[in-house]
Amino acid sequence: MAAKDVVFGDSARAKMVEGVNILANAVKVTLGPKGRNVVLERSFGGPTVTKDGVSVAKEIELKDKLQNMGAQMVKEVASKTSDNAGDGTTTATVLAQSIVREGMKYVASGMNPMDLKRGIDKAVFAAIEELRKISKPCTTNKEIAQVGAISANSDSSIGDRIAEAMDKVGKEGVITVEDGKSLQDELDVVEGMQFDRGYLSPYFINNPDKQVAVLENPFVLLHDKKVSNIRDLLPILEQVAKAGRPLLIIAEDVEGEALATLVVNNIRGILKTVAVKAPGFGDRRKAMLEDIAILTGGQVIAEETGLTLEKATLAELGQAKRIEVAKENTTIIDGAGEAANIEARVKQVRTQIEEATSDYDREKLQERVAKLAGGVAVIKVGAATEVEMKEKKARVEDALHATRAAVEEGIVAGGGVALIRARTAIAGLKGANADQDAGIKIVLRAMEEPLRQIVTNGGEEASVVVAAVAAGTGNYGYNAATGEYVDLVDAGVVDPTKVTRTALQNAASVAGLLLTTDAAVCELPKEDAPMAGGMPGGMGGMGMDM
């Protein structure tokens, strides 16, 4: 085991804070409508240009072990916020940096870090309750478009595309983002279905960039039992191989010898297959397999219907134009099922919804209707160059997450103003002692920081703008894109409540951990072994007396 270095107290914290600052300073320049770009080096190909906070954070690894620990903890803030809310990564990083910076001053002056953390947690809880109160539901297409535009760095065309896609497939529908072929963004709505089961082995992946398995014009085999013996599958595999098309196997499970054989065939390019588990459990699994069968124009191979795997033919298999299998979900696009059969199935499920007695059953049945009838919307991102395409695609994906979050929990005024307004709930808050009061003050100061950074990135004086916004009420705030003080919700500058809430929660959580850290353990760099001794130089012993 390698030797470890243990650093205590202020020495450990100071180094970790340096790491926090390096990462946060690189990320925060991207905040707001006038945020700057960050260029990321790639080991091959040209550099990537981005204004996405989490993309910048993920690239940062520092040489100093302690600094790197601090940076990685704040990277966690950005990643968690991105995973939970899809946006707000830069805001979360700015909040975390501010809480750490202010908190360290109090720790250095001798205050109790645990009480500071309790004060911080108390203030954050009050602020989140206030955010929920001032939140308003996001229902209209216009509001959805505004959220999408803000999240895509004030690009209204992206917001409009997302609103249009949600309008076409419904709020619950599946929306995916792909590379376009032209300079313009395009929207395609394709009949399709997505369920929450992914590939059973990563060896099925054939698109390493997106970490997905893509099958073009495949057959779909549906089976309600486990498949472990390859002999059961051989007859149908031979028929599919002759047809020269890929195959998706959806069964209760595919394991052992059967899975190994499919993987080997896939790697050798003999037969392109992907195996996934059937979605749902029990009776619901049977119903969902039946849904997929109707959508793809196939049949479920089950003993109840008198069909067995050994005797299955291509006629019993479903078909689709394209299927994408990711780690955790499978999307079937343009199934070959008859429209009339799909319509009849939807009608049948809607009848079951009306008769359902439990909320859970009703919710699951509604999900099935959305999957059968909703389809999949594909936003094709257009750009002039590949670098621009990648950057724009990342923004569209961010905006898509943000709009989903807005539909889920509502919207608040954007531009850092919601956090300024939520401070009113903290202003009168009192802790159990002076140290907890200091923790509350830390959060009060931190909640100004996103607005300050947005204004600074826009080239204006932050203190003046913060004072002017704090003096106002409601949605009155500073629109950094135009440099005017307006009602931000009317101007379309809005943030999803979930994004603002998640950013504050995650920032406080990780910053609290950093403040209460009193020792850090890291590996010492390995010392290079000394070089083996060699023969002395020159021609020893060959001297000549003159």
UniProtKB/Swiss-Prot annotation:
Q: What class of enzyme is it?
A: isomerase
List cellular component terms (GO).
Answer: cytoplasm
Q: Where does ATP bind?
A: 30-33, 51, 87-91, 415, 479-481, 495
Q: Which UniProt keywords apply?
A: ATP-binding, Chaperone, Cytoplasm, Isomerase, Nucleotide-binding
User: Which InterPro entries does this chain map to?
Assistant: Chaperonin_Cpn60_CS, Cpn60/GroEL, Cpn60/GroEL/TCP-1, GroEL-like_apical_dom_sf, GROEL-like_equatorial_sf, TCP-1-like_intermed_sf
Q: Which Gene3D superfamilies match?
A: GroEL, GroEL-like equatorial domain, TCP-1-like chaperonin intermediate domain
Query: What NCBIfam families does the entry give?
Result: GroEL, PRK00013.1, PRK12849.1, PRK12850.1, PRK12851.1
Its family remark reads: Belongs to the chaperonin (HSP60) family.
Quote the subunit structure annotation: Forms a cylinder of 14 subunits composed of two heptameric rings stacked back-to-back. Interacts with the co-chaperonin GroES.
Indicate what this protein is called per its UniProt record: Chaperonin GroEL 1
What organism, scientifically named, is this protein from? Paraburkholderia xenovorans (strain LB400)
**According to the entry, what is the taxonomic lineage of the organism?**
Bacteria, Pseudomonadati, Pseudomonadota, Betaproteobacteria, Burkholderiales
